Structures are given as structure tokens and as C-alpha cells.
Amino acid sequence: MMNPTNSRDVPLYIYHAGQCDPKKCTGRKMARFELARLYDKISRLPRSAILLDPMAEKALSPADDPKKGIIVLDCSWEEVERVFPELEKLNLEHRALPYMLAGNPVNFGRPFKLNSAEAFAAALYILGYKEQAEKVMSKFNWGHSFLELNREPLDEYATAKNSSEIVEIQSHYI
């Protein structure tokens, strides 16, 4: 059970398909530290939350309301295609993260190749939950790299009023 240290923390949820190396899985590590809840069934995910979806038409922005939580899918693209019909039933707010570089050792410096922890941290930072983003990244010895690599764009994204402004800011980094 997730037990946020701060009652104002945004609830974080992970659909975990069990397809990754357990020793490298950022989602499992977040769950061990009670920073996120893992689900192995789509039907159990909370309704009306924000789903971080790289194919979403709308970018995540500070205008989005994270009270119902943020969901990350920790699975292969094939699995995403398989579960997408179920996701549609949950009334989720699909949002894409803007341009950022991975800070993890597997994809270091590669644009848009974020792992689950980095995706959560980026979303939290953009939504104004910088301390919670830093808490998530503090559990990984490379976590500071992600925040340092992306500090400037994250600070700018956090000042945007809406999705359109996020896209405009993003264009300066691509």
C-alpha cells in the first residue's frame, strides 16, 4: 500500500506487465519505497487519472489536474496495443510528456527514452510538485543526472499555462 510521506503528494500508479529485468525495473523500486502502486491488471487502475501516453495529442501542462493520480505503463509496445481497448474504458486523461533527455544509464542522453521513474519525475515537476519529483529521483543513483540534464526545460515547462505553451517551449529544445 502506498503511504505518501506528504498527504499532498500526487498518487502514482504503474501498470506493470512484468516484462522487464526485475533488477533494473524502476517501477518495482518505486513500489518498494512506497512511492507508487503497481497493478498487473488494467481494470484495477484508478479512473479519471492522467495517463502518460507518448502518442497523446495533448501535452502535459500545469493546467492538468493530478489529484486523481498519474499512471505510467511499464510494458512493451505490443502490450500497450493489446491493453489499449481496456484503457479506453477508464476515462483517463491521455497526456504526452514534452522533449526531455534520459538520465538513466541505459538510454543516457537519448531524447524521449525515459524510464518509468523519469516519466513520473518529469510529470510531477511540470505539474508543480518539484519536491515529489526530487524524492522519486533520489532513490536512483543516476536520478540527479536526469534532473540536471533537464533542469532548464523542466523549469520552463513548469511556467507554461497550457498544452500549447508546452509545445511552443519544446520547439526551442528540439
Swiss-Prot record:
Using the UniProt record, give the first listed, main subcellular location: cytoplasm
Reactions catalysed: an N(1)-methylpseudouridine in rRNA + S-adenosyl-L-methionine = N(1)-methyl-N(3)-[(3S)-3-amino-3-carboxypropyl]pseudouridine in rRNA + S-methyl-5'-thioadenosine + H(+)
Q: Which GO terms describe its cellular component?
A: cytoplasm
Which is a GO BP term held by this UniProt record? enzyme-directed rRNA pseudouridine synthesis
Q: Which UniProt keywords apply?
A: Cytoplasm, Ribosome biogenesis, rRNA processing, S-adenosyl-L-methionine, Transferase
Q: What is its EC number?
A: 2.5.1.157
InterPro entries on file:
RNaseL-inhib-like_metal-bd_dom (IPR007209), Tsr3-like (IPR022968), Tsr3_C (IPR007177)
MF-aspect GO terms: 18S rRNA aminocarboxypropyltransferase activity; S-adenosyl-L-methionine binding
Q: Where in the cell is it found?
A: Cytoplasm
Record-annotated residues binding S-adenosyl-L-methionine? Answer: 26, 73, 97, 116
Bilayer-crossing residues are none
Function summary? Aminocarboxypropyltransferase that catalyzes the aminocarboxypropyl transfer on pseudouridine corresponding to position 914 in M.jannaschii 16S rRNA. It constitutes the last step in biosynthesis of the hypermodified N1-methyl-N3-(3-amino-3-carboxypropyl) pseudouridine (m1acp3-Psi).
Q: Which family does it belong to?
A: Belongs to the TDD superfamily. TSR3 family.
Q: What is this protein called?
A: 16S rRNA aminocarboxypropyltransferase
Look up and give the organism this protein is from: Methanosarcina acetivorans (strain ATCC 35395 / DSM 2834 / JCM 12185 / C2A)
From which lineage does this chain's organism come? Archaea, Methanobacteriati, Methanobacteriota, Stenosarchaea group, Methanomicrobia
